[in-house]
Amino acid sequence: MGRPPPCAIQTWILLFLLMGAWAGLTRAQGSKILEGQECKPHSQPWQTALFQGERLVCGGVLVGDRWVLTAAHCKKDKYSVRLGDHSLQKRDEPEQEIQVARSIQHPCFNSSNPEDHSHDIMLIRLQNSANLGDKVKPIELANLCPKVGQKCIISGWGTVTSPQENFPNTLNCAEVKIYSQNKCERAYPGKITEGMVCAGSSNGADTCQGDSGGPLVCNGVLQGITTWGSDPCGKPEKPGVYTKICRYTNWIKKTMGKRD
């Protein structure tokens, strides 16, 4: 566990890309919580929001007092991280905003091809340490991979309707279940790697535009980072796709350890 999948891109994946087989199936850029509800305020104390000025870019997950985990495609030239937030319209008591000091994409992430979602994971080092407490605290990283059928929580400020977009002011949550790798591959033929995990529900609960980089939490442990899925979102037969944390634990810990 913890070893990332190989960086090499298989020839058949490249053929899919060249043929445009991904058209209409991805939503990673910016990538709600469909069929969810408002989270209990500060029940997800590891949830963060990435902002470029006043614009929400992505979600993120606090994994250390100076470290946030998110999707690699969320990287921007200059942006900040908000912690302890619930309502984006008003300042919450525990809310903190810290500038990003450094963005470290996984070395195998292909930033030149927006259709390639492999290794879509990134560590953000904050300029200053976060003030930790009950409403702002890091989450534990998965050492073991999630089990099929396991119930998990997804959260974010992304759109709550699709294809029309309607962004909420408050953090939304929904319950999903882990899909088998075979079921995931049947939903997205030729597009799923061992570094990805699918999760969804029969009622269409799903992440969507604006949720990229946010957490998939199972039994209080971080098992996934929101990356991509179907467009429109919320199709029961087309689950959300997440970067599988258990495959990257070693890289995460090694990268954080080098700079702490």
UniProtKB/Swiss-Prot annotation:
Q: Which UniProt keywords apply?
A: Cytoplasm, Disulfide bond, Glycoprotein, Hydrolase, Protease, Secreted, Serine protease, Signal, Zymogen
Domain (Peptidase S1): residue spans on this chain? 33-257
What are the residue ranges of the propeptide? 29-32
| Expression by tissue | Restricted to hippocampus.
Say yes or no: keyword Cell membrane present.
Answer: no
Coarse class of the primary localization is: secreted
One cellular component term (GO) for this entry is:
serine protease inhibitor complex
Cysteine-cysteine disulfides? 39-173, 58-74, 145-246, 152-218, 184-198, 208-233
What catalytic activity does the UniProt entry give for this protein? Cleavage of amide substrates following the basic amino acids Arg or Lys at the P1 position, with a preference for Arg over Lys
Output one GO MF annotation.
serine-type endopeptidase activity
Q: Which InterPro entries match?
A: Peptidase_S1_PA (IPR009003), Peptidase_S1_PA_chymotrypsin (IPR043504), Peptidase_S1A (IPR001314), Trypsin_dom (IPR001254), TRYPSIN_HIS (IPR018114), TRYPSIN_SER (IPR033116)
Which Pfam families does the protein's record reference?
A: Trypsin
Where can this protein be found? Secreted; Cytoplasm
Q: What is its EC number?
A: 3.4.21.118
List glycan-bearing residues. 110
Record flagged with keyword Cytoplasm: yes
Q: Name one GO biological process term.
A: memory
Name the residues annotated as catalytic in the UniProt entry: 73, 120, 212
- SUPFAM superfamilies given in the database record: Trypsin-like serine proteases
Signal peptide start-end: 1-28
The lineage's top-level taxon is: Eukaryota
Provide the family line: Belongs to the peptidase S1 family. Kallikrein subfamily.
Q: What does this protein do?
A: Serine protease which is capable of degrading a number of proteins such as casein, fibrinogen, kininogen, fibronectin and collagen type IV. Also cleaves L1CAM in response to increased neural activity. Induces neurite outgrowth and fasciculation of cultured hippocampal neurons. Plays a role in the formation and maturation of orphan and small synaptic boutons in the Schaffer-collateral pathway, regulates Schaffer-collateral long-term potentiation in the hippocampus and is required for memory acquisition and synaptic plasticity. Involved in skin desquamation and keratinocyte proliferation.
Self-association state and partner proteins as the record states: Interacts with SPINK9.
Q: What is this protein called?
A: Kallikrein-8
Q: Which organism does this record belong to?
A: Rattus norvegicus
Q: Which gene encodes it?
A: Klk8
